[in-house]
């Protein structure tokens, strides 16, 4: 970043309306360590709570955190913190509250839905504590970071933890933070002991202890550069989010189809899967002596999705294969079992406010030497034009006592890319070579 642009980022001010309110009380919190205490004392004036309120009655709907950049009136936070008033500004409005209890309205300037970031404008300026200089701080695995925010709406707090590298399983880089990030801290900063911004608090795993994630500071820096060059905020953030989701699905599908799908044996078939850093596969066999059939499962899915709203996460692909084998059923009863399993699949309904009802077509096709019954269902996003959910369900028809049932789900893709995925998936099925694997 040149010095002129850096000055623009730290001094840029936007005109936005705000209204003061009385000081609010916060719950007492245990004292932090001396290093954390020093950081909090230096940074507390630049930490904000970001609230989403109903316009009617101004009752609180959701809360998160944010932080002022330099001496400007620009605030960095998470997209998911502001998503309600970004997508539905007629119903929701944003508000900031600082550590002294002062508050005011916010204006949304920019969003990055792919990295879960947003930039706001408020009617107060920072003290200059949080900066986004170039180059950014270099992190070493194991070094301590300090996360700031307002956990569970209990009061502003600071927590300590260790930086443990970049997570590759997410489609976009995230930093692993081995420390507590609780609800309400999303959008707050995580800093080094010197106060340099390392990342933005974003999420945590619910199935582990102290496994939390940060958005790398470089993505916030890029969004601030974008704000510095724009003359006014976008008039319609739904259109902005749509364009970013279309960008994501192009990259996602191109990466998935860059090489042929891998084939895994599920005798007597070979089934298409994709295993990568972003997409993991798991298998399971369910054979019980008291059951007249056996089931083998293989599931592959992306481990992350794009948060759009509290009711919608998208930009994700999953593959499932299920092999049913008769161990004590005749052909008629096994056919009934396999048909019931096929009919049990759910493709959604037309009562969904997010997507249209499924439009489905059914055909009998042949993939190499494997005859298949195939059902393709497509649903359009009501609010995000050009995006669709594709669901392809197949069942083998060549074995009287074996049924391979497979499903491909592609969420948040263009119509063209949905067809690309389904064609590649259908074309990949094959029979195991005679005499075993090659």
Report residues per predicted region.
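N-terminal targeting leaders that route proteins to membranes or the secretory/organellar pathways
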Residues: 1-38, 74, 362-363, 424-438
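Conserved hydrophobic positions within beta-strands
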Residues: 66-68, 106-108, 163, 280
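Non-catalytic interaction/regulatory modules that flank or connect domains
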Residues: 248-362
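N-terminal activation segment of mature serine protease catalytic domains
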Residues: 21-67, 232-287
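Conserved active-site neighborhood of the chymotrypsin/trypsin-like protease fold
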Residues: 47, 70-148, 153-156, 171-174
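Active-site region of chymotrypsin-like
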Residues: 43-59, 123-131, 154-231
């Amino acid at each position: 970043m040149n010095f002129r642009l850096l000055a623009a980022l730290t001094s840029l001010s936007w005109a936005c309306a705000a209204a003061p309110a009385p000081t609010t009380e916060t719950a007492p919190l245990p004292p932090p360590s001396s290093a954390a205490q020093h950081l909090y004392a230096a940074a507390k004036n630049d930490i904000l709570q970001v609230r989403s309120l109903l316009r009617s009655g101004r009752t609180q709907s959701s809360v998160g955190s944010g932080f002022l950049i330099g001496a400007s009136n620009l605030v960095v936070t998470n997209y998911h913190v502001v998503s309600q008033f970004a997508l539905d500004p007629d119903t929701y409005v944003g508000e900031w509250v600082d550590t002294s209890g002062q508050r005011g309205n916010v204006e949304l300037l920019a969003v990055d839905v792919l990295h879960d970031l947003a930039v706001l404008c408020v009617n107060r300026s920072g003290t200059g504590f949080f900066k986004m200089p170039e180059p950014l701080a270099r992190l070493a695995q194991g070094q301590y970071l300090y996360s700031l925010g307002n956990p569970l709406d209990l009061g502003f707090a600071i927590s300590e933890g260790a930086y443990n590298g970049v997570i590759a399983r997410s489609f976009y880089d995230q930093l692993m933070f081995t420390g507590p990030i609780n609800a309400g801290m999303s959008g707050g900063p995580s800093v080094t002991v010197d106060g340099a911004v390392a990342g933005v608090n974003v999420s945590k795993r619910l199935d582990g202890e102290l496994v939390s994630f940060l958005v790398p500071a470089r993505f916030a820096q890029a969004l601030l550069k974008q704000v510095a060059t724009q003359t006014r905020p976008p008039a319609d953030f739904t259109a902005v989010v749509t364009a970013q989701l279309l960008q994501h699905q192009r990259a996602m599908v191109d990466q998935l189809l860059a090489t042929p799908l891998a084939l895994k044996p599920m005798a007597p078939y070979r089934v298409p899967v994709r295993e990568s850093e972003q997409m993991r596969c798991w298998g399971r066999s369910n054979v019980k002596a008291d059951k007249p059939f056996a089931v083998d499962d293989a599931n592959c899915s992306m481990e992350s999705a794009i948060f759009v709203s509290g009711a919608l996460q998208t930009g994700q692909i999953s593959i499932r294969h299920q092999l049913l084998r008769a161990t004590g059923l005749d052909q008629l009863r096994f056919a009934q079992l396999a048909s019931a399993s096929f009919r049990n699949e759910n493709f959604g309904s037309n009562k969904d406010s997010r997507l249209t009802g499924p439009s489905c077509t059914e055909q009998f096709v042949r993939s190499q030497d494997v005859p298949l019954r195939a059902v393709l269902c497509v649903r359009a996003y009501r609010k995000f034009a050009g995006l669709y959910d594709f669901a392809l369900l197949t069942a083998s028809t060549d074995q009287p006592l074996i049924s391979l049932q497979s499903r491909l789900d592609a969420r948040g893709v263009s119509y063209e890319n949905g067809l690309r995925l389904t064609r590649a998936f259908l074309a990949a099925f094959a029979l195991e070579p005679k005499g075993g694997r090659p």
